[in-house]
């Protein structure tokens, strides 16, 4: 199966998210319905950095979870069976944070599905920076 890639414009045709809440810049690997790998480049101009935390900017953990969910949504919603639908984050388990993500970092975000039954999908995700684990965990998705 050919691995696909998506630029920001193509991602915005799949996901309803827009600035400041679109948290994936590119998909560099895509196996529809199975897995996706995305990139998020963190700029000092991200809207969350001034308040989290002043003088010590750190990407909020909940936004890292959302970034993994958005990459997963790209994977599932590119499958012909699910095109045109919405993906909702329905649950998280065993999320662990190993290091901080700060301005200038490039996040490598991988999400893959382990099971899909009906309108519910189960998967796992992780974020790495320069091969170093930032965070990871398990997800539950609902399709609307």
From Swiss-Prot:
SUPFAM superfamilies: Thioesterase/thiol ester dehydrase-isomerase
Signal peptide start-end: none
One Pfam family here: FabA
The EC number(s) this enzyme carries: 4.2.1.59
Keywords annotated in UniProt: Cytoplasm, Lipid A biosynthesis, Lipid biosynthesis, Lipid metabolism, Lyase
Coiled coil regions in record: none
Main location: cytoplasm
Gene Ontology CC entries for this record: cytoplasm; membrane
Reactions catalysed according to its record: a (3R)-hydroxyacyl-[ACP] = a (2E)-enoyl-[ACP] + H2O
Residues annotated as catalytic: 52
GO BP annotation list: fatty acid biosynthetic process; lipid A biosynthetic process
Family classification: Belongs to the thioester dehydratase family. FabZ subfamily.
Function according to Swiss-Prot or TrEMBL: Involved in unsaturated fatty acids biosynthesis. Catalyzes the dehydration of short chain beta-hydroxyacyl-ACPs and long chain saturated and unsaturated beta-hydroxyacyl-ACPs.
Name under which the protein is recorded: 3-hydroxyacyl-[acyl-carrier-protein] dehydratase FabZ
């Amino acid at each position: 199966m050919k691995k696909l890639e998506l630029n920001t414009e193509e991602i915005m045709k799949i996901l309803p998210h827009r600035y400041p809440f679109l948290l994936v810049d590119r998909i560099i690997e895509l196996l529809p319905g199975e897995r996706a790998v995305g990139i998020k480049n963190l700029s000092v101009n991200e809207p969350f950095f001034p308040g989290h935390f002043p003088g010590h900017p750190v990407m909020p953990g909940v936004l890292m979870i959302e970034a993994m969910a958005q990459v997963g949504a790209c994977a599932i919603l590119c499958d012909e069976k699910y095109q045109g639908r919405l993906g909702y984050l329905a649950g998280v388990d065993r999320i662990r944070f190993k290091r901080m993500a700060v301005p200038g970092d490039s996040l490598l975000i991988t999400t893959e599905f382990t099971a899909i039954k009906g309108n519910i999908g189960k998967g796992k995700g992780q974020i790495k920076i320069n091969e170093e684990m930032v965070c990871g965990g398990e997800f539950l998705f609902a399709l609307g």
